[in-house]
Amino acid sequence: MVNGLSEVGIKPDYNLLVIEHTKYVDTLLKLGLKVDVLDPDDTFPDSVFVEDPALTFANGTILLEPGAPSRKGERGLIQPHLTQTFDTVFKLVEGSAEGGDVLRLNKEVLIGLSDRTNELGARALKKLLLELGQESRIVETPRGVLHFKSDCSALDEDTILATPQLANSGIFENYNVILTPENEYSAANSLRVNEKLLVPNGYPRTAELLSRKFDVEIVGITEVAKLDAGLSCMSLRW
């Protein structure tokens, strides 16, 4: 797990990382979710970030194809569990796409093109989403951003938390947008769970801003962030 991909270049502390993951799971349980924790696999150190190799909806799942070479094969780890859970299972067979580039909204699904999700994969994913009754739109992820959702998250049906650079692209012109404060752009990957809004630690101005409208809970992911990951990365939710 600590040997996962990282652009930050700082190796996380294994024991602290395990503690953060355990507290993350405990938080989801406390908020009323049923949580299945899969066994670790050292062959794929990034496999703890289960959001990337699959998408899950109430009526089915889509197995994706990660764009990072070291993550090829991760969907094979998660496939047995998802096929036991869902009657409808689709598999992306063209291009690459990672769940971190997919933002699910009430009216549509946004697919962000990035170094991990290419045009071929996005177009193939768009067709599979339609099979599940989901309209989608392909958009551009800002340069230098790992995943589309590194810079945004859905706070409710009509409200997006986004970095200024992503908000200024016009992608969210039909939504209400809350901008992350300067120097707190990584807080853009927050996570709405039922009535609670989970916000990563270390971003006090963002937490204060969001607490004016939402019930905020701070979740520690200091070590997780060293692996270029955020709150949404460690779970598949439906």
Task: For every predicted segment, state its role.
Residues M1-W238:
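The feature marks the mature, well-folded catalytic cores of soluble enzymes
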